[in-house]
Amino acid sequence: MDKLIRNSRGKSQITQMMVGVGDEKDEEIIRAVVYLNKNFRLSRIDFSAFFPVSHTPLENKPPENPLREYRLYQVDFLVREYGFSFEDFKPILRDGNLPLETDPKTAWAEANKHLFPIEINTADYDMLIKVPGIGKRTAEEIIKRRKEKRLKSVEDLKGIRNVDKILKYITMEGKNFYNKV
C-alpha cells in the first residue's frame, strides 16, 4: 500500500461510495472518509445515493435521499480541506447519522457553542475556517484586512461573502453584530 501511495504522488486519487445500499450509518461512512483521506490523500470521494433499478435483486429497496449524499460530500470536503476529524462530527450525529436539515459545518458550530463567538481580530486561520460562512479565501481576506487595521464594524467586512451568516459566530472588538444588521 505504501508503494501505491508513493507511486501516485502528483496524481489525482478518487474513490466512490454508494450510500444507502446497505444499512450503513453515516458514522461508519465518516470513519472511512477520515481514514481514506488520511492514508491515501484522495482528491475527493464521490458519493452516489442508491436508486433501485427494475428487474434487479434490489428493485424493491427504497431509494436513498439525495440530500444524504450531499451531506456526506460536505463531510469529505471538511475533512480534506479544513482538517475536521471524526471526533468533530460525533456531537452532531443522531443515531449514527448526520442531520439532513443543516450542513455539517453549521451543525458542528451549533454543537460547539462554547467556542463561539470568536474574536475575528485574533482568531487563527484554523479557527476562522471552522466558522460557518468562512472558507479558505475568506479567512485569508480577513487576515489580510486585519493586518491593515483592526476590524471593528460590519462596514470593515464589506465585500466579504456570507457576512450575514458569519456575524452569528464572530465578535469584532468584543462586539457581536448579529441581528443588528
Label the predicted regions.
Residues R145-R146:
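Residue-level signature of tetratricopeptide-repeat
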Residues D23, R150-L151:
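Conserved aromatic
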Residues Y35-L42, R161-I170:
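Structural recognition of alpha->loop->beta junctions
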Residues H55-K130, K165-V181:
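Long, highly charged, low-complexity intrinsically disordered interaction regions
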Residues P117-A123, L128-V131, I142, L151-I160:
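A short amphipathic alpha-helix within small helical-bundle interaction modules
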Residues M1-F84:
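Conserved AdoMet/S-adenosylmethionine-binding subsite of the radical SAM
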